[in-house]
């Protein structure tokens, strides 16, 4: 099958979500030390104690900016679940590990899709996560964070959808958000098994039956708490 070259410069395989082959049990280590945009080593009088200042990453404009925005969120989620599997919380069952491994692999697929699809000249670099607020040895801390990430991801894709101009990208975003919603429901079921929480009123509006849609300007401040690299969505479309 031949690759399709979009006018915007994005290359992808027709009808496929993942232009790269990623196995279900693929285990990729996250290069957390990489800082998007490069790290600036500030000049200081005490050369033995230099200060590393991460450069602010501008996500860009138009559809490319929205794809970079999604790429940033997928980097965050993939890094989080990778750490969860590398350092399982106390009492993690085999069933929980299997589920969380599957979610990790899905997030890696999403991350690698955006990495391959966005032209290198426009693509943001690897982001450095900041998970200091998460206790990875504690089940409640890990699953509570997973719930927050998945709910945020669903709302972010829903909010970004109307900002995407290219129909192909919009379709792909719709496919990804459907998977993210499945993740959100699965995590909620782990926290409160066999309850209505998998699609609770706190996340699905009773009057519309829809998940929330949150604009990038409202999503980024929450995501930034878990990303050491400063992000700027100032140039992203708003309508």
Model-derived features: positions:
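All-alpha RGS (Regulator of G-protein Signaling) helical domain and cognate RGS-like helical scaffolds
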Residues: 2-21, 31-33, 46-239
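N-terminal export signals
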Residues: 26-44
């Amino acid at each position: 099958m031949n690759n399709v070259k979009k006018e915007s410069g994005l290359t992808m395989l027709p009808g496929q979500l993942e232009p790269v082959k990623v196995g279900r049990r693929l285990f990729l280590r996250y290069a957390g030390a990489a800082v998007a945009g490069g790290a600036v080593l500030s000049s200081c009088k005490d050369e033995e104690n230099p200060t590393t200042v991460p450069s602010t990453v501008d996500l860009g404009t138009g559809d490319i900016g929205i794809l970079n925005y999604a790429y940033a969120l997928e980097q965050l989620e993939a890094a989080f679940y990778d750490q969860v599997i590398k350092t399982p919380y106390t009492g993690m069952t085999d069933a929980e590990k299997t589920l969380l491994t599957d979610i990790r692999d899905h997030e890696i697929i999403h991350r690698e899709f955006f990495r391959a699809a966005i032209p290198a000249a426009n693509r943001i670099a690897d982001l450095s996560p900041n998970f200091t607020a998460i206790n990875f040895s504690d089940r409640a801390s890990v699953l509570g964070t997973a719930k927050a990430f998945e709910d945020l991801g669903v709302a972010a894709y829903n909010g970004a959808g109307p900002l995407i101009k290219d129909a192909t990208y919009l379709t792909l975003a719709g496919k990804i958000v459907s998977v993210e919603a499945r993740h959100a429901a699965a995590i909620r079921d782990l926290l409160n098994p066999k309850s209505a929480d998998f699609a609770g009123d706190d996340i699905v509006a009773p009057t519309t039956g829809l998940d929330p849609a949150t604009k990038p300007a409202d999503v980024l401040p929450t995501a930034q708490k878990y990303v050491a690299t400063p992000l700027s969505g100032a140039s992203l479309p708003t309508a």
